[in-house]
UniProtKB/Swiss-Prot annotation:
It comes from Streptococcus thermophilus (strain CNRZ 1066). Pfam families: PALP (PF00291). The beta subunit is responsible for the synthesis of L-tryptophan from indole and L-serine. Tetramer of two alpha and two beta chains. It catalyses: (1S,2R)-1-C-(indol-3-yl)glycerol 3-phosphate + L-serine = D-glyceraldehyde 3-phosphate + L-tryptophan + H2O. The gene is trpB. This is Tryptophan synthase beta chain. Its EC number is 4.2.1.20. Pathway: Amino-acid biosynthesis; L-tryptophan biosynthesis; L-tryptophan from chorismate: step 5/5. The modification N6-(pyridoxal phosphate)lysine is found at residue 91. One of its GO terms (molecular function) is tryptophan synthase activity. The lineage of its organism: Bacteria, Bacillati, Bacillota, Bacilli, Lactobacillales. The keyword Lipid metabolism does not apply.
Length: 402
């Protein structure tokens, strides 16, 4: 049966929907209508395709990581090089698409949330390109962790608002951005950075990010004589790079799909972001999805060395894939991710983002159980420039025995 999700009400099975206050429903309905129209408009897609090619630098290579493959000694590993996009990650695919959509809707201002800063940088970049006012909401903890990206956003003309509520991380930035959207609904478009939030956001983000999987599928077919890979893999926080990789393969039942979530200091601690391992369904940021919550239903703090993965929920479509068994989600600790970070740097000369390092770490485990005539495509969602100082300080502290 051909996969067709979401349904007319924005649900993926029981997950998703539009759990927003009445004050936001108008904006959500307006966005849904505008998106349906844009999808049917060939000139909209043509403008986006032109930007992706000539501004972002797509298509990104599908690179055969031979040294990594030899080191692990299992499946042939291919890297989908989203780190080579303009701004250094997959986030630009969605940011450009949504700014084009905002322009089409006649909006003058752009707001967005960011964790690691990559979505903030991508949104600020797209807003600069289209001469739009831009405010980025970022948790105070992430502002400290990602000072370089904060400066980048400001350099691009965006205002960065440091959020001091709650645990001062990504979920708090989303709350602040949603509040700002309610206040400026007439002239403002909110660019959700991950496959989260009320419908139609998860679908919009999925569709704009699906360029990752579409390209990878075609590129692999070209080098393999028309075959499909045996598996595809990506790291997962909210889940946008993963859904972009997975969605074009969802009807290809022979292709296994793996997501690497962050288990931080370990599943036996409270310092993790492993929603599938430890969460249960609840409503967060306008959608029903698996979330990390305590016995009283209060949303818990997520933790990861990677600022882009410490979100206490996972997008509704991933929740549906998990429930029906279409994708497998495993958790990777900070230590394992750091090993992946070092390994790819040493073996392939590619410094990955800490987010992507979780996928590299899971690839080691999965590829080792596969045979050399099988293949695994890993989404290398971003480059590690933003994380080098943090990793340097971590390694120095460990060397001093702190």
């Amino acid at each position: 049966m051909t996969y067709q999700q979401p349904d007319a009400k924005g649900f993926y099975g029981k997950f998703g929907g539009q759990f927003v206050p009445e004050t936001l429903m108008t904006a959500v309905i307006e966005l849904d209508k505008a998106y349906r129209e844009a999808k049917e408009d060939s000139s909209f897609q043509a403008e986006l395709d032109d930007l992706l090619k000539n501004y972002v630098g797509r298509e990104t290579p599908l690179y055969h990581a031979k040294r990594l493959t030899d080191y692990i000694g299992g499946a042939q590993i291919y890297l989908k090089r989203e780190d080579l996009n303009h701004t250094g990650a997959h986030k630009i695919n969605n940011a450009l698409g949504q700014v084009l959509l905002a322009k089409r809707m006649g909006k003058k201002k752009i707001i967005a949330e960011t964790g690691a800063g990559q979505h903030g940088v991508a949104t600020a970049t797209a807003a600069a390109l289209f001469d739009m006012d831009c405010t980025i909401y970022m948790g105070e903890e992430d502002v400290k962790r990602q000072a370089l990206n904060v400066f980048r956003m400001e350099l691009l003309g965006a205002k960065v608002f440091s959020v001091t509520d709650g645990s001062r991380v990504l979920k708090d930035a989303v709350n602040a951005a949603l509040r700002a959207w309610v206040a400026g609904i007439e002239d403002t478009h909110y660019i959700m950075g991950s496959a989260l939030g009320p419908a139609p956001f998860p679908e919009i983000v999925r569709d704009f990010q699906s360029v990752i999987g579409r390209e990878a599928k075609r590129q692999y077919a070209e080098i393999s004589g028309g075959k499909l890979p045996d598996a595809v893999m990506a790291c997962i926080g909210g889940g946008s790079n993963a859904i972009g990789m997975f969605y074009p393969f969802v009807n290809d039942k022979s292709v296994a799909m793996y997501g690497a979530e962050a288990s931080g200091l370990g599943l036996d601690t409270e310092k993790h972001a492993a929603t599938f391992a430890k969460g249960r369904p609840g409503i967060l940021h306008g959608a029903l999805m698996d979330v990390l919550q305590d016995a009283h239903g209060q949303i818990m703090e997520a933790f990861s060395i990677s600022a882009g993965l410490d979100y206490p929920g996972v997008g509704p479509e991933h929740c549906y894939f998990n429930e029906i068994g279409r994708a497998t989600y495993d958790s990777i600790t900070d230590e394992e991710a750091l090993e992946g970070f070092k390994l790819l740097s040493c073996l392939e000369g590619i410094i990955p983002a800490l987010e992507s390092s979780h996928a590299i770490a899971l690839a080691q485990k999965v590829a080792a159980k596969m045979s050399p005539d099988q293949s695994l495509i890993v989404c290398l969602s971003g480059r590690g420039d933003k994380d080098v100082m943090q990793v340097k300080e971590r390694f120095e502290a460990e060397a001093e025995g702190k």
